[in-house]
Design a protein with these regions (language model features):
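Short, strongly hydrophobic alpha-helical membrane anchors
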Residues: 1-35, 196
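Hydrophobic single transmembrane helices highlighted by the model
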Residues: 25-52, 210-214
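Transmembrane alpha-helix/interfacial motif
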Residues: 39-81
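Predominantly long cytosolic amphipathic alpha-helical stalk/bundle segments
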Residues: 68-174, 186-198, 225-258
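Helix-loop-helix
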Residues: 177-211
């Protein structure tokens, strides 16, 4: 009889909403954000804006680098066309120049364009007779400067907006930490005003504070990963630009200004 009594009592406690098994309502993260203090809301808004801007930059930069790599590979195929042999003539450079104009997203094509234009200028200014050695060296230096300047411009263009990713990756966690510290401080102020240190009083403020840290990390982690990836891809393209500039300058030296 006692066993039946205790079984019925346990069943009644579980089924009753106000019984011992009933807990307090779960904390809703969205409601915590809405109920956050103005300072924490500003922190969260700044972090969200930083995260959104980073994702736009990541998408645009990814498309830019993929297109640059693909079109640069096509340009190298055109430039080193084996069907043309090893002979370099003005007609061959003109043909490469004509095809390179359609590869507008290729850094290599734009570097070639700069070198081609400078070569045309120095050869057009030369006399019909064979130029003296100092003049040849000056012309080579002029073409080399044009190639170097164009390569630097391409690297600068590829690195555009990457500082935003680097800044977000390094600053966003600290901005989130500031929001966390502010939220925890408000929680302790609330405890002092109420004179009650129960979990129901402390938990909302702590949860609100930790949300700021979570948003900061969510903004920083993708930014750092994308920045490192893009820097690696840009360094590969930069080495390709340097190698092509050296090869093109050797061709100019041997076949046009030798």
């Amino acid at each position: 009889m006692d066993d039946v009594f205790y079984a019925n009592l346990v069943t009644l406690q579980v089924a009753t909403p106000g019984g011992a098994g009933a807990g307090h309502g779960q904390l809703d993260p969205w409601q915590l954000v809405l109920d956050a203090s103005p300072v924490v809301k500003i922190v969260m808004l700044v972090l969200v804006l930083m995260s959104v801007s980073c994702w736009f930059i990541i998408g645009g930069k990814l498309v830019q680098l993929l297109r640059a790599s693909a079109q640069s590979a096509r340009f190298l195929h055109v430039f080193w066309d084996k069907a043309q042999g090893s002979a370099w003539t003005t007609e061959r450079l003109e043909a490469v120049y004509g095809k390179a104009r359609s590869l507008e997203s290729s850094p290599l094509a734009r570097v070639f364009h700069a070198g081609y234009v400078e070569l045309a200028r120095v050869t057009g200014d030369a006399d019909a007779t064979q130029p003296a050695q100092p003049e040849v060296q000056a012309d080579l230096d002029s073409v080399a400067r044009a190639l170097h300047r164009a390569a630097n411009n391409e690297v600068t263009l590829l690195e555009n907006l990457l500082p935003v990713l680097a800044t977000t990756g390094s600053v966003a966690p600290f901005i989130g930490l500031f929001g966390t510290v502010w939220g925890v401080m408000n929680s302790f102020i609330g405890i002092g005003n109420l004179g009650n240190a129960s979990l129901a009083v402390v938990a909302p403020g702590i949860a609100e504070a930790l949300i700021a840290t979570a948003i900061g990390l969510a903004a920083a982690i993708p930014a750092v990963m994308a920045y490192n990836y893009f820097i690696r891809r840009i360094r590969v393209l930069e080495s390709e630009l340097d190698a092509f500039a050296s090869d093109y300058l050797n061709i100019v030296r041997r076949h046009f200004l030798g």
